[in-house]
A protein has these predicted regions:
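Conserved phosphate-binding and hydrolysis motifs of nucleotide-dependent enzymes
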Residues: 1, 5, 38-40, 78
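Acetyl-CoA-dependent GNAT
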Residues: 1-33, 44-46, 50, 87, ...
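Short glycine-rich loop/turn motifs that provide flexible caps or phosphate-binding loops at active sites
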Residues: 4, 22, 37, 82, ...
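Conserved glycine-rich acetyl-CoA-binding loop
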Residues: 18, 27, 31-45, 54, ...
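C-terminal "cap" of GNAT-fold acetyltransferases
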Residues: 57-60, 64-71, 77, 87-110
Length: 110
């Protein structure tokens, strides 16, 4: 088989009380040949289910401003942009901004 996509969900240590309710998406990737088929959204939904099953209430993630498709996927899945870092990456001599998102996945935070 060939890997079509992946999502890496990171859970904080339970000893970190201040963020013990929040999981983060570290990597979310869909191969170019597999895009446009809903896989990115299905991976997100699976990650949210896993986080809920482990009693997490929120998921956070970050994305480069140049990743337009990913931004559309996150926003259509209910993620809210809460911040921008003007210099998130430097590629060559170009400064690229980064966006920060969150989604509450339980009623506990509403």
């Amino acid at each position: 088989g060939v890997v079509a996509g992946s999502l890496q969900l990171v859970f904080p240590l339970k000893s970190n009380e201040s963020s013990s309710f929040s999981a983060s998406i570290d990597t979310h990737f869909v191969a170019p040949w597999a895009r446009g088929k809903g896989l990115a959204k299905r991976l997100l939904e699976s990650g949210e289910e896993l986080a809920r099953s482990r009693s997490f209430s929120q998921i956070i993630l970050e994305v480069r401003e140049t990743q337009k498709r990913a931004i559309r996927v996150y926003e259509s899945a209910g993620y809210t942009r809460w911040g921008t870092l003007p210099t998130y990456h430097i590629v060559g001599k170009e400064k690229i901004s980064g966006y920060f998102y969150y989604k509450n996945i339980s009623k506990e935070l509403d």
